[in-house]
A protein has these predicted regions:
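Extracellular/periplasmic ectodomains of large secreted or surface enzymes and adhesion receptors
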Residues: 33, 260-304, 338
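Signature of exported/secreted
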Residues: 68-73, 81-189, 227-228, 239-241, ...
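Histidine-rich, glycine-flanked metal-binding segment
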Residues: 312-354
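C-terminal motif of bacterial Sec signal peptides marking the signal peptidase cleavage site
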Residues: 18-20
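Divalent-metal coordination cores built from histidine and acidic residues
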Residues: 180, 346-354, 360, 369-519
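Solvent-exposed helix/loop surface patches that form functional interfaces
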Residues: 42-52, 58, 62-65, 132-223, ...
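Bacterial N-terminal signal peptides that target proteins for export
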Residues: 1-8
Length: 519
């Protein structure tokens, strides 16, 4: 029987937690400069000037104590690096500097951060400036005052004073990775509390999800899996080694795209860690759902709503829908439906019951999407581009009844070579087509999603091989083609409406219309 969804609540599949993303080119002065309670006007100065002051080797030469390199990834494709260095300061503290940067689809995303930390792990000052995505920037600092409070500066906001109570960490969003390293060091040093205050704002919930061995080259390494909530919207996953060092992070960036960072020497583990994050995240969501479950007989009757059956017929008024656990067993007018003895009855008079909704262009980037979708009445999503290991792990867990979420229809994202490419599944020549499509078919992908950097000459052979395997071909129209050429080459659909507009206008007219609309 067709799945139905009762639309009672709609939760946004967006997020708070990016409050540090301010659109400004100016930012804080160099670490340690100025009065901690100084006005916002003290934060002037270009990013380049500030970076020069904060990250230069001015003054007597000091030996670098430690250097850590993290490899940054988007959809498991390496896009940049973060290099963290530690240098002893004259006052006995350690100056940590993070140089974080990546290139996303041809756009540079640079970020710098600096921390001044005592031997006992107290962060005396923190600042970060630069870009957190192609479309957002961060510009802030927090300085520890003598009374134990932090004075927080964000450009465009009045300075505020925050005095943490109990264990706390200093971080703002997913980047830089160094901030998360300090956060987890503080969590361990504080006795692994369930919650910690977050400076500049927020509360963290941190939980160990257990330890597991992973094969690495010719040895096995045991890593502890830790989940963190409150730093970004939803849960992120991190892994620590036996000494508490941060090894890897699987999270979302400021565009809510899949983002991963892994310490140098552990790159080979990233696909397995990403898959583990998806599977464990769905398991965690199931645990949350079970803790909120109310007792019932297993049979539930929704009584009194208007029922729309999706066939085009008029709505059935004063309807009854009966389901037994996850199966709808009866639906229709109250007068014709017998409610089983012992069923839990819920009065939904005044509401409307619809067939489960479909989201036809989704990027199921984190496990919390499952609960949000179901609460919004969405029972099927078509995922049009994701980390294959992550999304198939989530899909399989839900299909096996071990997770919370809608049915997921997976597309396999493929792209060509070049700086603007997305993901790790690359088709550069005809020789790549068969093995790539065999991999996608084996993973249960229903469609091939072509991205923008695929060579136009490869579209037709990709479509031929995809259709042989019963897979549709959809996606972006590659650069160098128009939508008519893509359709003639075998496209079954395009993912964005703008690709349809070009053929409707004379040459040059579309760009004129775009400029007029922008004005």
């Amino acid at each position: 029987m067709r799945k139905l969804a009762l639309l009672l609540l709609a939760l946004p599949i967006g997020a708070a937690g990016l409050g540090a993303c301010h659109r400004s080119a100016a930012g804080p002065a160099a670490p340690g400069s100025g009065d901690p309670s100084g006005s916002v006007s003290n934060l002037k100065g270009s990013t380049e000037e500030r970076a020069g002051r904060a990250l230069s080797d001015e003054g007597p030469k000091r030996a670098t104590k430690e250097v850590t390199v993290y490899h940054l990834h988007k959809f498991l494709r390496k896009i940049g690096t973060e290099r963290d260095s530690a240098t002893p300061a004259p006052d006995g503290t350690i100056e940590w500097k993070a140089n974080f940067g990546f290139q996303d689809r041809g756009n540079e995303v640079p970020l710098a951060a600096a921390f001044r930390v005592t031997d006992s792990g107290v962060i005396k000052s923190y600042e970060a400036w630069g870009s957190t995505s192609r479309m957002s920037v961060i510009d802030e600092r927090a300085i520890l005052d003598s009374d134990g409070s932090y004075v927080v500066h964000r450009l465009g906001e009045a300075p505020k004073r925050v005095k943490p109570q109990g264990p706390f960490a200093v971080a703002s969003g997913y980047a830089p990775v160094l901030a998360q390293d300090f956060m987890l060091r503080k969590w361990i040093a504080s006795g692994r509390p369930q919650t910690m205050a977050l400076i500049p704002e927020g509360t963290l919930t941190i939980e160990s999800r257990g330890k597991e061995p992973y094969p690495l080259e010719d040895k096995s390494v045991e890593l502890e899996h830790v989940s963190v909530r409150g730093l970004a919207w939803g849960r992120e996953d991190v892994w620590l080694d036996g000494s508490g060092k941060l090894i890897a992070v699987v999270t979302r960036d400021a565009e809510f795209d899949a983002f991963q960072a892994v310490r140098e020497g552990y790159l080979a583990l990233l696909p397995a860690l990403s898959a583990s994050a998806g599977a464990d995240g769905v398991k965690w969501m199931s645990e949350v759902a079970k803790s909120a479950e109310r007792p019932s007989s297993g049979v539930i009757a929704l009584v009194g709503a208007d029922l729309v059956d999706g066939t085009g017929k008029p709505a059935v008024q004063d309807a009854v829908v009966i389901y037994d656990r996850d199966k709808i067993v009866a639906a229709g007018p109250r007068a014709k439906i017998t409610i089983p003895a012992g069923a839990t009855t819920i009065d939904v008079t005044g509401k409307t019951i619809l067939p489960g909704l479909w989201d036809m262009h989704a990027h199921f980037g984190q496990v919390e999407h499952g609960a949000a979708y179901l609460a919004s009445g969405v029972t099927t999503v078509r995922d049009l581009g994701n980390v294959l290991e992550f999304i198939t792990g989530v899909r399989d867990a839900i299909d096996a009844g071990k997770g919370l979420g809608p049915r997921i229809l997976v597309d396999g994202l493929v792209d060509g070579a070049g700086q603007k490419a997305v993901g790790t599944i690359i088709i550069k020549s005809n020789a790549d087509i068969v093995p790539v499509l065999d991999r996608l078919k084996k993973a249960g992908c229903l469609e091939v999603k072509i991205y923008s950097s695929i060579e136009p000459s490869l579209v037709k052979p990709i479509a031929v091989e995809a259709h042989k395997r019963g897979m549709r071909v959809v996606g972006h129209v590659p650069e160098g083609m128009d939508v008519v050429e893509a359709l003639n080459a075998g496209f079954d659909g395009v993912s964005h409406a703008q690709y349809l507009f070009g053929p409707l206008f004379a040459p040059g007219e579309m760009s004129k219309l775009s400029r007029s609309t922008l004005r």
